């Protein structure tokens, strides 16, 4: 029996794939648990349209993420002025929240979960590298510079 997978299943295939399985497995397991759909010509057409729509949405999200990365690269570096000790340690720390507020004040729409600090909170003066990941595997690095007041 031919079915269209609605979810990725280990050892069977990926979502949207047309596969052939035994009749009992399809009728008693895959179809009742909504893991697959009977592969009629109508269902194949509907699923193909849905897949094309999802691909278009994915492409839009990727384009938007790339445009946001270009905007981050135009900025170059973000500068913070903080009080510090003689040992170059700042009073307080700079975290994701502070960086996102600074980027928002520069006119970029940034969520806190899109910014990653590889070494944790920033506690020392100097230049630090921060990772910006707007969508899945699309990311870039930018600099955060901390100077003494």
From Swiss-Prot:
InterPro entries: Ribosomal_bL9, Ribosomal_bL9/RNase_H1_N, Ribosomal_bL9_bac/chp, Ribosomal_bL9_C, Ribosomal_bL9_C_sf, Ribosomal_bL9_N, Ribosomal_bL9_N_sf. Pfam families: Ribosomal_L9_C, Ribosomal_L9_N. The keyword Ribosomal protein applies. SUPFAM superfamilies: L9 N-domain-like, Ribosomal protein L9 C-domain. Belongs to the bacterial ribosomal protein bL9 family. GO terms for biological process: translation. Keywords: Ribonucleoprotein, Ribosomal protein, RNA-binding, rRNA-binding. This is Large ribosomal subunit protein bL9. The keyword Ribonucleoprotein applies. It comes from Buchnera aphidicola subsp. Cinara cedri (strain Cc). One of its GO terms (cellular component) is ribonucleoprotein complex. Binds to the 23S rRNA. GO terms for molecular function: rRNA binding; structural constituent of ribosome. PROSITE patterns: RIBOSOMAL_L9.
């Amino acid at each position: 029996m031919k079915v269209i997978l609605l979810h990725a299943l280990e050892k069977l295939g990926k979502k949207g794939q047309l596969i052939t399985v035994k009749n009992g497995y399809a009728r008693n397991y895959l179809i009742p648990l909504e893991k697959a759909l009977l592969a009629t010509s109508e269902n194949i057409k509907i699923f193909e349209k849905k897949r094309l729509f999802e691909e278009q949405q994915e492409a839009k999200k990727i384009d938007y993420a790339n445009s946001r990365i270009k905007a981050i690269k135009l900025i170059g570096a973000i500068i913070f002025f903080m009080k510090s000790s003689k040992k170059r340690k700042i009073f307080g720390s700079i975290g994701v929240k502070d960086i996102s507020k600074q980027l928002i004040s520069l006119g970029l729409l940034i969520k806190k979960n899109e910014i990653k600090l590889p070494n944790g909170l920033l506690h020392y003066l100097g230049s630090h590298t921060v990772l910006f990941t707007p969508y899945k595997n699309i990311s870039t690095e930018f600099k955060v510079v901390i100077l003494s007041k």
